[in-house]
Amino acid sequence: MSKDGINSKDFLIGTLIGGIIGATTALFLAPKSGKELRDDLGSQAVALRDKTDKMTADAKEKGTQYVSIAKDKTSNITQLVADQSGQIMNKVKDLRDRSKSDKTDSSTAMQDMREEAMQAADETKDQVLQTKEDVKDELKDAQKQAEQLNR
């Protein structure tokens, strides 16, 4: 037991002496005084905070821009669908009126009405799909830029 006490005592003394020697060496070999070192660390912390604030502001601005783009594209789709629906309804009414005035050509008029309605629906579908792809591309670009800002 006395050996364990001596080993612990020797270890504590060695640790204390080693700490004092290390601290003294660090003070003598430091390239700057403590005040200069604290000032440099403070200025670097301020610069880092400013850079972080700028990156946060940029990310918020880009996010706002992409939300605006998505809203514009969505409103364009809505307007496009409304316009196409109105055109289809007008064509249907026109063809119905024509078929009423000319009973002999009613089957032809119905066929024309179907074809025009299908054509208008296809056009609307194509435009909506294209706008959807545009929005998807814009969102991918936004995501890439957000990832770059996070690096």
UniProtKB/Swiss-Prot annotation:
UniProt cross-references to InterPro entries, sorted A to Z: Desiccation-related_membrane, YtxH
Lineage, top-rank taxon, reads Bacteria
Q: Where is the signal peptide?
A: none
Stretches assigned to coiled coil: none
In this chain, composition skew of type Basic and acidic residues spans 91-105, 112-151
Task: Please name the Pfam families in this protein's record.
Answer: YtxH (PF12732)
The annotated region (Disordered) lies at: 89-151
Tell me the protein family, please: To C.plantagineum desiccation-related protein clone PCC3-06.
Protein's name in the database: Uncharacterized protein YtxH
Which species does the entry assign this protein to?
A: Bacillus subtilis (strain 168)
